[in-house]
Every structure is written in structure tokens, then in C-alpha cells.
Amino acid sequence: MTLPASPPRYAVIGNPIAHSRSPQIHAMFSAQTGRPLRYERLLAPVDGFLPTVQAFRESGGLGLNVTVPFKLEAYALAEARLSERARLAGAVNTLSWRDGAWHGCNTDGVGLVNDLLRLGVALAGARVLLVGAGGAARGVLQPLAAAGCARIHIVNRTAARAAELAAAWRAAAPRTGTQVSAGALAQAAEPGGWDVAINATASSLQDAAPDLPGGLYAPDALAYDMMYGARPTAFMRQAEADGAARCADGLGMLVGQAAESFHIWHGVRPDPGPVLLALRTELLAAG
């Protein structure tokens, strides 16, 4: 009697990792597409990323989502086999085992752009304010530029970090029609206002908003926080008080980046909509 083959194995690796919704998301994608898989949380010691990945691979693992604090180590692991998105992001959140080696991609920015499009944002020609200059901000620059944004202005509490990110982007990125500039938080204002403002800081985790000036938003502008929760984040509340027509949190970005990872691994593009609705309903019920 032939035993049934085990489903392919995937995981999300991080530290901490118990909070991750990735297993739930990928289980729903699996049910939706009919692609069986085993997906789990993988807690790695802070100084033990590579041994944990090696053990996962030796047990038959085929793909990893990578979260804090290992995205730079994942980049180094796959440095010879990076997608253009990962190279420009300087970080990897998706590892795929192919042809005897790990390949790295970054799906965070695609998840953001797809969610902005879902929300009805016209990114072609848009003026975008990007708050924060860390890895989350760097990871979304290329997809925003590829979507046709006319201008991306990076602001940060430490203005020099914003300037460094803008300069690094201009040096490394392919020529696009997107103007990338930088400044301090106090230099966030723009005549006529921004079409989209994106909070790429973790300030909302402390229920705080970045120290931004008022008058930031153009008519019908969207304020988007990469963080998410059962209630509007501090950044969303700040934006609404400043006149933003619409506000959204990052739950759709989370589901969108997972959908892109699923597509990379399985060659099938799942529908994020039902999964996003299920997670939102669960969040609201818990909140």
C-alpha cells in the first residue's frame, strides 16, 4: 500500500513569532486554491537564524516567510539569487528553495500597492508622503515607483536617515519618472497637499502618531498606516483630524504580501478579499 505524500512544508520564521497570522492566512489560501500545504510558525533564536533555516530545509521545507528580526540575514542568505524587488529593498521576506538554493524576494511593497489599488487609489501621477526611513519604508519604494507615483517624499524624525534612504534609492534604482526627496518630519507639508500619506513607522504600536505638521492632505487623500488593529490607529486618528478624506490600516497589506508569497511558491494567485474580510471580522470581534 502506498502512503499518501506529505503536503509541501512552509513556515514563517521570526522572533517573536507566536503572534503571526501567517499560518491562518496561508491555510485559507490553501483551501481557496485547492493547493495542500503544511504551514507553521518557526521560532528561531536571535543568533540562530541560519541553523534554524538549515534544519527546516533538511526536514523538507520549501519556503519561508521571514519577519523581524531576520530580513537582513535572509537577504544575505540569498544574496546571489535575489529578485529586483529584494535587491532594492535591501531585505528579504520570502525565501524559496529552487534548483538546490534559496532564492529571495520581498513582497511587502507589492502587498502595499495592491491594497492601495483595492482601496481605489490612483497611484499613477500620485504625490506620496512616506513617513519613516527604516526597512519598511525602503521595502515599498520600488513598487510605489513602478506603480507610477510622480513624487515620493520621505520624512523621518532623524532627517539624515531620510536623506540617506533617498540618496541610496537614487543611486541603486532604475531610472523612473518618480521624484524621490527627503526631509524632517517638520518638512512634510506640500503645497496642494499629498494624495497619499503612508506611515511606515511602528509608532502606532505605542498608540502614538509621528510628530507631523497639519495641512498635509489634498482633497480625497488617503492616509495609510502599515500597522493595524481592531480600532483606528493613532496615525489614522491624527490624519482624520487633519482632514484626510479616507484612512486605512495595514491589514490588507499583510494579506497582500502573503498572497504574493503564495503565488511565488505555488504559481497560483489567490484572492485576498475573502481572507481580508475574515481577518477583519475576527479583529473586530476580539476588539
UniProtKB/Swiss-Prot annotation:
InterPro entries listed in its UniProt record: Aminoacid_DH-like_N_sf, NAD(P)-bd_dom_sf, SDH_C, Shikimate_DH, Shikimate_DH-bd_N, Shikimate_DH_fam, Shikm_DH/Glu-tRNA_Rdtase
A GO term, aspect molecular function: shikimate 3-dehydrogenase (NADP+) activity
UniProt xrefs under Pfam families: SDH_C, Shikimate_DH, Shikimate_dh_N
Keyword presence, NADP: yes
Catalytic activity of the protein: shikimate + NADP(+) = 3-dehydroshikimate + NADPH + H(+)
Catalytic machinery residues: K71 (proton acceptor)
GO biological process annotation, one example: amino acid biosynthetic process
Summary of the function given for this chain in its UniProt record: Involved in the biosynthesis of the chorismate, which leads to the biosynthesis of aromatic amino acids. Catalyzes the reversible NADPH linked reduction of 3-dehydroshikimate (DHSA) to yield shikimate (SA).
Protein name from the UniProt record: Shikimate dehydrogenase (NADP(+))
Organism: Bordetella parapertussis (strain 12822 / ATCC BAA-587 / NCTC 13253)
UniProt lineage: Bacteria, Pseudomonadati, Pseudomonadota, Betaproteobacteria, Burkholderiales
